[in-house]
Swiss-Prot record:
Its EC number is 3.4.19.3. The gene is pcp. Its main location: cytoplasm. It catalyses: Release of an N-terminal pyroglutamyl group from a polypeptide, the second amino acid generally not being Pro. This is Pyrrolidone-carboxylate peptidase. Homotetramer. GO terms for biological process: proteolysis. It comes from Lactobacillus helveticus (strain DPC 4571).
């Protein structure tokens, strides 16, 4: 199986984004599955276009998008993408999102095709904190998650996709004011999650 795994570039004044740092360090093969790694710009609409082009080029059987969720203490696979965007923080184009629906003709929400409960159980079995999340927010992470689900439901019915949020790195934790996780643990957790998803 070919699996496309994406991570966002730094945004919001940060010099690093654990998403792309962890994705870059994933092995090129997990449990016999080829891992295609892709950096994605933290920009509304452009992020989805970059991933769509990669899907067209690579024709993967699975897509897993990874993003940073400052304030969370666990690796959190997302259950649902919602058809709404909002936010006060500009994206990396310097613009904020236009508040409202992402796709005018899209469903209010799309559920992931990934076995998120099994993924969480496997990550925990590896000794790392994990839990299912029921909200990917309304920023670029949810936007990308929704756009890929919209694409699946219209053009790629056999493609499986989902989104995983990871915590801050220790260097981003503002002297312990926020939860964090080491990069090595993030890579381990994502590897376990991907292996579990690929087996189902």
């Amino acid at each position: 199986m070919k699996i496309l795994v994406t991570g966002f570039d730094p945004f919001g004044g940060e010099k690093i984004n654990p998403a792309i740092e962890a994705v870059k360090r994933l092995p090129d093969e997990i449990a016999g599955n080829q891992i295609i790694k892709l950096e994605v710009p933290t920009i509304f609409y452009q992020s989805a276009e970059v991933v769509k082009k990669a899907i067209e080029k690579e024709n993967p059987e699975m897509v897993i998008n990874v993003g940073q969720a400052g304030g969370r203490s666990a690796i959190t696979p997302e259950r649902i993408a919602i058809n709404f965007q909002a936010g006060s923080t500009p994206d990396n184009s310097g613009k904020g999102p236009k508040e409202g629906k992402i796709q005018a003709d899209g469903l209010d929400g799309y559920f992931t095709q990934l076995p998120i409960k099994k993924m969480v159980a496997a990550i925990r079995h590896a000794g790392l904190p994990a839990q299912v999340s029921n909200s990917a927010g309304t920023y670029v992470c949810n936007h990308l998650f929704y756009e890929i689900q919209y694409l699946i439901h219209h053009d790629y019915p056999n493609l499986k996709a989902g989104f995983i949020h990871i915590p801050y790195l220790p260097s981003q934790a503002r002297n312990g004011r926020y939860p964090s996780m080491s990069l090595d643990n993030m890579v381990t957790g994502l590897t376990v999650a991907i292996e579990t998803a690929a087996m189902c």
